[in-house]
A protein has these predicted regions:
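Generic recognition of flexible, low-complexity loop/linker segments
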Residues: 142-145, 155-157
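Short beta-strand segments
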Residues: 1-17, 23, 33-37, 44, ...
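A short, compositionally biased
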Residues: 149-152, 189-191
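Charged, gly/pro-rich active-site loop segments
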Residues: 44-144, 184-268
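Surface-exposed connector loops and short turns at secondary-structure junctions
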Residues: 22-26, 188-189
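A short, hydrophobic beta-strand micro-motif
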Residues: 28-33, 192-195
């Protein structure tokens, strides 16, 4: 879902039951958002890429208010969600997914460039922090069947020369033990990076992705860890049985998690 733009901030949300984004933003508030995929966004293939780097603020004190805010956002964007969420039964069935943490990003820098043109110099270099430990690469055998499902160029996420997160679309060629990158930034030897392959159909009729974390050697990306998300070839995306089971499990575990955190039950 596209973030809301409120009070000169970008507003994102993540689940209370899967709070990794919020934890990461609290640990290091420097974040980035790349606007590059026109699907379900109102943008077109002719629009330029836009990268926003900013400082994140995490809102997780009032989960009731956060959840109501998220429900209002969903109902304003989707007729299907309006149908489901008008019913208390529908809201309670999705409670584990609807329980939200909000992350608001105060923009600090904006980079805009045309598709097919060179990257802006400010994000044209990948740095390696002193704390990053390069690990042994893993084989791509398991990923090869997945890669053919993703026709759109993947997103390469990295740290720029000042240590700020950045992300760009790149072209890739998959080899047996590495992935060749073209159209991306120059890389410091051993710079950490993450490739995200994303498949979105229509207005979230299907939403599937996986990530490959690794490091760079010149223009070669060496994978260290494969991370799947949201579906398989025959069971993917929103509306799938797999995602419905995921939401059902979140809802089942939500009361215990709220109690563990000392929070009151949600009123839906």
């Amino acid at each position: 879902m596209m973030p809301a733009y409120e009070r000169e901030r970008l507003a994102f949300s993540t689940g209370l039951m899967y709070p990794m984004k919020a934890r990461n933003a609290r640990r290091d508030p420097r974040v980035a958002a790349l606007f590059s995929d026109p699907t379900a966004s109102g943008r077109s293939q002719d629009d330029p890429f836009v990268l926003v780097q900013g400082l994140a603020e995490v809102f997780d004190h009032d989960i009731q208010r956060n959840t109501e805010r998220y429900i209002a956002q969903l109902m304003g964007k989707s007729s299907l969600m309006r149908f489901v969420l008008r019913s208390a039964v529908g809201r309670k069935a999705m409670a584990g997914y609807l329980a939200r943490i909000w992350i608001e990003v105060i923009p600090q820098r904006e980079h805009v460039w045309d598709r097919g043109s060179a990257l802006p110099p400010a994000i044209g270099f990948m740095s390696r922090p002193a704390s990053f430990v390069v690990r042994a690469p893993v084989a791509l055998d398991r990923a090869m069947p997945w890669l053919r499902r993703y026709p759109r160029p993947p997103v390469l996420a990295y740290l720029d020369e000042h240590g700020w997160p950045a992300a760009v679309r790149v072209h890739v060629a998959v080899r047996s033990d590495h992935i060749e990158i073209s159209g991306g930034p120059r890389a410091e030897d051993g710079a950490p990076a993450c490739l995200t392959y994303h498949r979105l159909i229509g207005n979230y009729r299907a939403n599937d992705a996986f990530l490959i974390r690794g490091h760079m050697r010149a223009d070669r990306f060496f994978p260290e860890k494969l991370v799947g998300y949201g579906g398989t070839r025959d069971d993917r995306g929103i509306g799938s049985l797999k995602l419905l089971a995921f939401i059902r499990d979140l809802t089942r575990r939500l009361p215990d998690e709220l109690a563990r955190q000392g929070r009151p039950p949600l009123k839906l």
